[in-house]
Amino acid sequence: MKKYILLLVLAVCACVFAYVNSGKDETPAKPVLRIGVECDYAPNNWEEKRPSAFNLPLSNQEGAYADGYDLQIAKLVADDMGATLEVRKIAWNDLLPALQRGEIDAIFSGMLDTEERRRQAAFSDPYEVTATEYSVVVNTSSPYANAKKLTDFSGAKFTGQKGTKLYSSIGQMPGAIAMPAVDNVSEMLDAVTSGKVDGIVINLDTGRSYEATHSNLKLIRFPENEGFVIGFSGICAGVRKNDTELLNRINMVIERTTKNERQKIMDATVSRLLKNAS
């Protein structure tokens, strides 16, 4: 009889112990915000090989890290959500498909909210410091290095990234020759630095960083109302169309971050980029 009583007591104690311990694991896990980044469009995003106080590890590429203005804005969103930020490096043409497949929650990759892309995803308000402006970067040895207007590029050879406005905008320069499109922005940069093409169309901020880090490149900016017609709001974050809660949270953070604060983020980002290039 004593044996049965002892077993009963042990069973009750085990149940109590299990109940008490089960309560220890009831704290909700920290949410994760998964973003996709191309890592090839400085100063918005680029890849590094060493960790720093500013970059984030790429979850799908061991020993690699991502930094850039896009990443710093995404950090603000993740902090506001109380979430861990997970960054995946994804090729440009696979960013929207990856979003639709559910592999990532948002795109923070210098992406413009073009009409075609708006059919595939919902986009936040622009988070740039200033409105998007396209410029031209030319090789200083090109006969077009002193061009000042879009019409001055007749006969010039240009290339751009496949499936982007950087390539289709070449058609706005009368007489310019659109060479075959390339797969990424790095190949655009290689083409103009090597002299394979005379120039490339590029976002103004990126063009400035190229000019600052390459002695044989020159940025050409056009007067207001005399440059490219771009037809979109600007650089935005992309989410799935039904993810209104995340979209609203991103927009709230963008609205709350003043232009002055965003300028400071961009200035610090460009400073790191130039330091890395020196």
Describe every region a protein language model picked out:
Residues 1-32:
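Short, low-complexity disordered leader/linker segments with a strong preference
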Residues 16-20, 165-180, 218-221, 251-278:
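Ligand-binding clefts/hinges and TM-proximal coupling segments of bilobed small-molecule sensing domains
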Residues 28-111, 119:
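Extracytoplasmic small-molecule ligand-binding "clamshell" domains
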Residues 39-42, 63-80, 135-187, 204-205, ...:
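Bilobed "Venus flytrap"/periplasmic-binding protein-like clamshell domains
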Residues 40, 128-140, 211-255, 272-278:
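Periplasmic-binding protein-like
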Residues 73, 149-152, 203, 241-256, ...:
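Short amphipathic alpha-helical coupling segments at ligand-binding clamshell hinges
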Residues 75, 79, 84-152, 224-230:
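Acidic, polar ligand-binding/catalytic clefts
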Residues 93-94, 108-120, 169-172, 193, ...:
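A ligand-binding cleft/hinge motif common to bilobed small-molecule-binding domains
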